Amino acid sequence: MGSKKLTVGSDSHRLSKSSFSSNKSSHSATKDQPIDTDDIDEDDESGHNIILNIISQLRPGCDLTRITLPTFILEKKSMLERVTNQLQFPEFLLQAHSEKDPLKRFLYVMKWYLAGWHIAPKAVKKPLNPVLGEYFTAYWDLPNKQQAYYISEQTSHHPPECAYFYMIPESSIRVDGVVIPKSRFLGNSSAAMMDGSTVLQFLDIKDGNGKPEKYVLTQPNVYVRGILFGKMRIELGDHMIIKSPNFQADIEFKTKGYVFGTYDAIEGTVKDYDGNAYYEISGKWNDVMYLKDLKQPRSSPKVFLDTHKESPLRPKVRPLSEQGEYESRKLWKKVTDALAVRNHPVATEEKFQIEDHQRQLAKKRIEDGVEFHPKLFRRSKPGEDLDYCIYKNIPVDEDPEKQIRSILQIAPILPGQQFTDKFFIPAFEKIKSQKKMIENEKQNPAKQ
C-alpha cells in the first residue's frame, strides 16, 4: 500500500556488505572506519586467568545465569536489541508475502530466518543481560516506503525471558517471539540453550481453516568453545525447525568434531507433512548457503543465500534524550561508553551499580509481597504459542493506519513521541481498562 510514513527518519543505517564471521577478529582500522571494540578479542593471558578463576568454581552442567562474567566479553548491546539482528532483512519477508506459491513462500521465509545469524561481533562477545522491566523499541524505514515497528521487554529474570513484537502493518506481516536463554557450563565449553520460539504470520494469507498463515520457528543453540584451553570461538549447534501449515524444514547447525568436520556448516531438508522431500540445504550459516531441488535429481545445488552480498537494514532508534530510564540504550549507556573505550574497571563498576539496584528492588518486592508485572506484554492465554504476547489487541483485518496508531500507543517508537502516564501501568491493568472501554462503547454507541 505504501502510504506516507508518520515521520522522516535519519540517513539510511546500512551495514557494509561484509560477513560478520564468528571466528575472525581484526584490530585494523582506517581513518574512516574506526575500531569497533565488539570486534576485539581481549582473551589475553590476564583475561583468560579471570575466566579460569570463575570456571574453577563450577561443575559441568551448572547454570551460568547467576554468574557474573568479566566485562571484556560483553557486547555493547542488550539482548533486547540483539534480537533485531534477525529482523534486518525485511526484503525476504516482503518477497515471501507477495509470493503466491506456498512452497516458494516457505523458501523465502527460510531465507529470511537464516539471513541474520551471521550478524555478530567478530570477537567472542555476549549481549548484556536485560534487567527486569527493561524495554527497547525501534523502527525501520523500508525501501517500499512502508515502516516496520519493534517492541521488546524483559518479562522475567529467573529464568531470563524477553518477549518481542514486530510488525509491518501495510504488508500484513506480524512477528511475535520469546527468547529464553539457559546457560550451562560444559567443561571446556559453555552453552546457551535457546528455548522459546518465533511466530511469523501473514495476516492476509489464510490457511485451510481461514486463519492467518502461521510459521513457527525455533533457534539453534549457541556454544562458546575454548574457555579453559585453546582459543575461544563461538559455534551455533543443534537444530532449527521451521513449520508452516504445509511444509517444515529441519536444519542442523553442525558443530566441528575434535578431529573431523568443519566449522559453521548447516545441513537440512524441506519436506511436507506426508514425508515428501523437496529441497536440501547445505553450506555455512555465516558464508554461502546452497539449495538443491530434489525433484530434479541431476541438478546441482544453487546458491540460496550469500551472506557477503546481502546488506542488513539496521533499526533506527529514538534519541537518548527522548528515552526512558529503563530503555536499553539509556539504561546501559555508562557501561557501553566504558566498553567503547575499553575501560573495563569503569564498565564493571557501572554494571554493578545497575545490577545491585535491581537486587534491592527485588528484595523490596519480596518484603512488600508485590509481584512484578510487565508493562508491554501479557501472559498468554491457553492455546497460544508463546509465554507472552503484546498486551494490546491489534485486529487482523483492521485498516493499516489504525494498526499503526494502535502500535504507537503501546510505547514511544518514533522520534518525537512522548511517554504517557498509561505507559507505566502494568499490562494486565491496561487490558482491564481496555475491556471497560469496549463495554462502555457497546452500551453507549451514540457516544462513539
Swiss-Prot record:
Protein keywords: Cell membrane, Cytoplasm, Endoplasmic reticulum, Lipid transport, Lipid-binding, Membrane, Phosphoprotein, Transport
Subcellular location field: Cytoplasm; Cell membrane; Endoplasmic reticulum membrane
Superkingdom in the source lineage: Eukaryota
Outcome (variant: L69F): Does not affect binding to phosphatidylserine
Record's keyword annotation contains Transmembrane: no
Reactions mediated catalytically: a 1,2-diacyl-sn-glycero-3-phospho-L-serine(in) = a 1,2-diacyl-sn-glycero-3-phospho-L-serine(out)
Residues given in the record as a 1,2-diacyl-sn-glycero-3-phospho-L-serine binding sites: L64, T65, R66, I67, T68, L69, N129, S183
Modified residues (Phosphoserine): S16
Gene Ontology BP, a term: endocytosis
Gene Ontology terms for molecular function: lipid binding; phosphatidic acid binding; phosphatidylinositol-3,4-bisphosphate binding; phosphatidylinositol-3,5-bisphosphate binding; phosphatidylinositol-4-phosphate binding; phosphatidylinositol-5-phosphate binding; phosphatidylserine binding; phospholipid transporter activity
Main location: cytoplasm
Region described as OSBP-related domain (ORD): spans on this chain: 54-391
Stretches for region Disordered: 1-42
Outcome of substituting H157A: Does not affect binding to phosphatidylserine
Domain notes: The OSBP-related domain (ORD) mediates binding of sterols and phospholipids. It displays an incomplete beta-barrel containing a central hydrophobic tunnel that can accommodate a single lipid molecule with a flexible lid covering the tunnel entrance. The ORD can bind two membranes simultaneously. It has at least two membrane-binding surfaces; one near the mouth of the lipid-binding pocket and a distal site that can bind a second membrane.
UniProt miscellaneous comment: Present with 2550 molecules/cell in log phase SD medium.
Subunit structure, interactors included: Interacts with the AAA ATPase VPS4; regulates OSH6 membrane association. VPS4 is required for membrane dissociation of OSH6.
Function: Lipid transport protein (LTP) involved in non-vesicular transfer of lipids between membranes. Functions in phosphoinositide-coupled directional transport of various lipids by carrying the lipid molecule in a hydrophobic pocket and transferring it between membranes through the cytosol. Involved in maintenance of intracellular sterol distribution and homeostasis. Catalyzes the lipid countertransport between the endoplasmic reticulum (ER) and the plasma membrane (PM).
Family: Belongs to the OSBP family.
Protein name: Oxysterol-binding protein homolog 6
Organism: Saccharomyces cerevisiae (strain ATCC 204508 / S288c) (Baker's yeast)
